[in-house]
Amino acid sequence: MKVMKDNTKIYSSRQEHLVAKLVDGTVVAGSGARDLHPGDVRNNEFLIECKTHMALTDRIEFFADVWDKISSEAESRLKFPALVVDNGTQTLEGSWVLTRIGAIQIANCKMFECPCKISVNLKFSHDQFLKITNMLHQKFNTPIAYVIPFNPQSLVLLTLKDFVEVRFK
């Protein structure tokens, strides 16, 4: 089973280093050792949890329990929580971010109600949602954010690219 865990760590590490570079942050040493080192990436304002896949997938899913955990860990450190999930590519283009609405500069983006169905978790087709988002980018020429009522909070969903543009540029 060690081989599988090592392979998983390679994909996770690739994603974590990409996110850290984009948000001017650092990869948390020993990330995965939850109690001692919460989150995977941190900077001055955010504690970020990263989730990826070992194979390409069209399904993006944000799990409520993962959001609750990173949210609680971030609050205890006076940081904003963010959850990054990708489609297995560990790339900017394949990644989505869930964070609190107060964590982004809403004046720097166009806000829409999220068309996703939400039960306990937030899940959607990466390809379909990216197509809609790209059409909105072309129409409004600005970053796009989707407002989501999730675990009685107002959250926003953005592509990783839009998150970086709205928050870090």
Please identify what each model-predicted range represents.
Residues T8, H37, R42, G88-T89, ...:
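Intrinsic disorder/low-complexity detector
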